[in-house]
């Protein structure tokens, strides 16, 4: 019996050669619409699918393949006598191969100012239906969604007379992989257009491979990097960054770069951020990025070694000359002067990343994996309220308020328990990841290379006891910003008054785990 293949593709890469080879191997080709026209124009004999269904394409092509004569031929179990008898009674032929790829939904939703009607018309219905039917019946049918698999299928047919069970299973798996991804894009796009910010009962995220990584967090762990393919998430992310120079990014590089970019988004004035092991080891703002970088370097010249440095302004030659003096894994910026890029590129292993933007628009969920599930929450975008409360006898000066706001922006991005000490919009000491707050305070104080008189302190959560304020006062710190909310707040306020410290309660906590 002559084998039959249905070919209906939007992406026509390689399809002419594949169809010609199938014809040479004795297959009949059934096709639809644009694909049929394309094959015929290139002198490939095909059967119009309407001749199989005995029904015309209708509704501007919305209904072409949705017919029992097609789907019975795809779904029939070929060694089931009842199925075979039914097909014979109804004069329906079995289908041996389905070659389909889908309307460009992803490309459509990424078009600027795309009309919603165009989005709707690019939701493929008949294609996924045929693909899923064929993938379900993979024991008997070969299904191809990816043009990259044409060669594999032809090779097996030529060598073995048919496609192996293992390959059919592999190809069917690819179909369900892609159709799930395709449907996830549709679901998320519809949810966004409706303005629905609720947490759904069933959450799917459309993820596409950016790169296969050499390894994960450690060399014995395999890893890959995926990006969310939705048009409404922030463009300012590590997945969209353009690599201008250097080795491929590692798993840890990507984590640290993400932390650097997210912290940079807090600042409008020229700012430099240094990240090590997913924590800031130095942050500073200045009149220009050269000044900001020098402040960051001077705040902790040890930890910055082998770290990541990121800027929210174009990198100039003067700054590049300073960066070149030390070993860094990555330099990130919105742009680089030509001579700055040339200079940094002399370090062959240095990864140089250019950000598309540093916008703060709608964001997708913040997602963390746990064994057996995922935790999903809103991004922590809470800003400092202007109605923060001064709870001490002394009010902070204007300069202290500027430094307090600076430190508050930084502490939000430090692992809890987190303390940031700052002065002149420059971090002096950062205490991170401690299991109690006084240790975080002591850690931040001990790490400072500078006199802390006149410095300010930010805490990501309230002080459970007054000991942290006592330690800050003894170190010369003159202002504190913290959420407040402890049952012992009065003890901390009394300690602040004792040392003439101005203290602000924000009412906002910024835990980070």
Curated annotation (Swiss-Prot):
Name recorded for this polypeptide: Bifunctional purine biosynthesis protein PurH
Catalytic activity: (6R)-10-formyltetrahydrofolate + 5-amino-1-(5-phospho-beta-D-ribosyl)imidazole-4-carboxamide = 5-formamido-1-(5-phospho-D-ribosyl)imidazole-4-carboxamide + (6S)-5,6,7,8-tetrahydrofolate; IMP + H2O = 5-formamido-1-(5-phospho-D-ribosyl)imidazole-4-carboxamide
Record domain MGS-like: where: 1-145
Keyword Hydrolase: yes
EC number(s) reported in the record: 2.1.2.3, 3.5.4.10
The family this protein is said to belong to: Belongs to the PurH family.
Gene: purH
Cited InterPro entries: AICAR_Tfase_dup_dom_sf, Cytidine_deaminase-like, MGS-like_dom, MGS-like_dom_sf, PurH-like
Any one GO molecular function term: phosphoribosylaminoimidazolecarboxamide formyltransferase activity
Transmembrane segments: none
GO CC annotation terms, alphabetical: cytosol
Biological process, per Gene Ontology: 'de novo' IMP biosynthetic process
Entry annotated with the keyword Iron: no
Domain notes: The IMP cyclohydrolase activity resides in the N-terminal region.
Keywords: Hydrolase, Multifunctional enzyme, Purine biosynthesis, Transferase
């Amino acid at each position: 019996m002559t084998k039959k293949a249905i070919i209906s593709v939007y992406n026509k890469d390689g399809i002419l050669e594949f169809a010609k080879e199938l014809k040479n191997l004795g297959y009949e080709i059934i096709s639809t619409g644009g694909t049929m026209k394309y094959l015929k124009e290139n002198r490939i004999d095909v059967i119009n699918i309407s001749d199989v269904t005995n029904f015309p394409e209708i509704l501007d092509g919305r209904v072409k393949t949705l017919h029992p004569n097609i789907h019975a031929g795809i779904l029939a179990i070929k060694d089931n006598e009842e199925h075979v008898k039914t097909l014979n009674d109804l004069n329906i032929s079995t289908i041996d191969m389905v070659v389909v790829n889908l309307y460009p939904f992803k490309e459509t939703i990424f078009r600027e100012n795309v009309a919603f009607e165009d989005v709707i018309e690019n939701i493929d219905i008949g294609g996924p239906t045929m693909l899923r039917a064929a993938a379900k019946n993979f024991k008997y049918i070969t299904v191809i969604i990816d043009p990259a698999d044409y060669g594999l299928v032809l090779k097996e047919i030529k060598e073995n007379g048919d496609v192996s069970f293992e390959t059919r299973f592999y190809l069917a798996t690819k179909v369900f992989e892609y159709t799930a991804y395709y449907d996830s894009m549709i679901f998320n796009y519809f949810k966004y257009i409706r303005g629905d910010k609720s947490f759904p009962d069933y959450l799917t995220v459309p993820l596409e491979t950016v790169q296969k990584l050499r390894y994960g967090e450690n060399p014995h762990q395999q890893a890959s990097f995926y990006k969310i393919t939705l048009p409404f998430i922030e463009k300012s992310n590590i997945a969209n960054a353009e690599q201008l120079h250097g080795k491929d990014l590692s798993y840890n590089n990507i984590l640290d770069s993400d932390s650097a970019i997210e912290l940079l988004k807090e600042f409008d004035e020229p700012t430099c951020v240094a990240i090590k092991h997913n924590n800031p080891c130095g942050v500073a703002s200045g009149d220009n990025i050269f000044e900001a970088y020098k402040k960051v370097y001077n705040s902790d010249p040890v930890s910055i070694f082998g770290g990541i440095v990121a800027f929210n302004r174009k990198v100039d030659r003067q700054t590049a000359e300073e960066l070149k003096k030390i070993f860094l894994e990555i330099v990130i910026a919105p742009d680089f002067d030509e001579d700055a890029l040339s200079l940094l590129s002399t370090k062959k292993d240095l990864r140089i990343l250019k950000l598309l933007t540093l916008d703060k628009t709608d964001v997708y969920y913040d997602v963390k994996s746990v064994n057996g599930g995922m935790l999903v929450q809103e991004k922590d975008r809470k800003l400092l309220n202007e109605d923060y409360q001064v709870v001490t006898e002394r009010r902070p000066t204007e300069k202290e308020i500027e430094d307090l706001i600076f430190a508050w922006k930084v502490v939000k991005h430090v692992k809890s328990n987190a303390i940031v000490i700052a002065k002149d919009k420059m971090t002096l000491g950062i205490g991170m990841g401690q299991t109690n707050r006084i240790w975080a305070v002591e850690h931040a104080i001990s790490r400072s290379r500078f006199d802390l008189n006149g410095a300010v302190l930010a805490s990501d959560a309230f002080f459970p006891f007054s000991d942290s304020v006592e330690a800050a006062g003894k170190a010369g710190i003159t202002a504190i910003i913290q959420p407040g909310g402890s049952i012992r707040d009065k003890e901390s306020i009394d300690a602040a008054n004792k040392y003439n410290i101005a203290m602000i309660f924000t009412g906002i906590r910024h835990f980070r785990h």
